[in-house]
Amino acid sequence: MMDFTQGSILKKLLRFMVPILGALILQAAYGAVDLLVVGRFGSTSGLSGVSTGSQVLNLVTFVVTQLAMGITVLIARYLGEKKEEQIGSIIGGGTVVFAAISLVLFVVMVGFARPIAVLMQAPEEAVGLTAAYIRICGAGIFFIVAYNVLSAIFRGLGDSNSPLLFVFVACIVNIVGDLVLVAGLGMDAMGAALATVFAQALSVVFAIVRLVKKGLPFTITGYDFRWNPQCGKFLQIGLPLALQECLTQGSFLALCAFVNRLGLEASSGYGVACKIVNFAMLIPSALMQSTSSFVSQNVGAGEQKRAKKTMFTGIGIGLLVGCFVFVLVFFRGNLLAGIFSADAAVVQRGYEYLKGFAPETLLTAVLFSMMGYFNGNGKTVWVMLQGLIQTLLVRLPFAYYMSIQPDASLTNIGLAAPISTAFGIVLNVACFLYLEHAAKRS
């Protein structure tokens, strides 16, 4: 376990963040491999099916990750407060809660896969493959949820290396699975979904074995595996984050539906662009996750000034890397899109979206670091509220308006993300200054 309450903030934050970033890169990589292999060896309908279906899976995964953030923050806080004996009941209660969530997701994704595909306005020729992708991923949702919860537990313990190993295993298995099922057996989108589920299953087995063998500073008993007071505590932290993430990802699903109305090429191009966007957002996402744990442990130890310095350090790291990512996405986005598809029209449509989205790579460095700071302080209701405002008042209305124009442009639709993020930064700066003023007065 890593002690974040002393020593160089920059060095320790980077040391903790790099494995998280590595895990996110590998996670995005095995998602991208699905699209890459289907794009090269499958059909255009299969590519659209994976593109649209993976948007649904991303929604589920990101919401579960944010809900599990409550476990991460609470474990880190108890470590800072030297109350390790409380952690066993967090893990036991979390297992029960997320098992119930998995059961609900299983029923919805398997039983309503086709209506979901239709709701997403998947192109008519891709509805069947989109539904198949969603149904297969839904059948394996227990493994997908379990992986994210186990990773949250390890990060809360200050161990970001183990989740990196878990996703490395999943990535290798998924690549092999895609090559065998899609390129070899011609299973198209269904093969990609099967490879994803099997990879997550093996990763979960590996994670459980590592947790059991790990020398833990607490004990877990059978009595911990029930609804207990810790469940309410981590849900109080995680639920607002999950709702905020649900609406954010939901807005991107709506965006996907807006784009799908523009035709198969636009749908496939947007899917390709989304995979590149996933990679571009990895640094801010890693910063938010690492900052949340870092800040939470310091808040638990009463080191509020150090917690604030952590936020500003995160912003600096994010902006430095964000400049490079912005240049790459804005000026060479066509080359990036060409990695995922050999269809010139699909590549061009993907690049159109990326040019509008590019400023987001800089703005999220600020926004996500601030969100990590608020998460670590337990201000997750605020994180939810600012996300609601961004989504409902800016991102969705702007994207919808741009999508219904006679000469609808994917570049203009892509601008919805950076414009809403800029608005979110203003809101978060105002909240930070308000809390600082209130703290000085008290």
List the predicted regions and their residue ranges:
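Short alpha-helical transmembrane segments in multi-pass integral membrane proteins
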Residues: 1-17, 75-142, 184-239, 295-360, ...
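N-terminal transmembrane alpha-helices
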Residues: 4-36, 40-41, 55-70, 74, ...
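Transmembrane helical elements of multi-pass membrane transporters/channels
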Residues: 15-34, 136, 170, 199-203, ...
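Hydrophobic residues within alpha-helical transmembrane segments
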Residues: 18, 22, 53-59, 96-100, ...
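Helix-terminus/linker motif at the lipid-water interface of multi-pass membrane proteins
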Residues: 25, 29-48, 117-124, 180-187, ...
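Small-residue-rich hydrophobic transmembrane alpha-helices
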Residues: 47-107, 144-163, 269-333, 364-386
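Hydrophobic transmembrane alpha-helices of multi-pass small-molecule transporters
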Residues: 59-62, 174-178, 203-208, 279-282, ...
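Short runs within selected transmembrane alpha-helices of multi-pass transporters and secretion channels
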Residues: 68, 137-155, 163-171, 192-205, ...
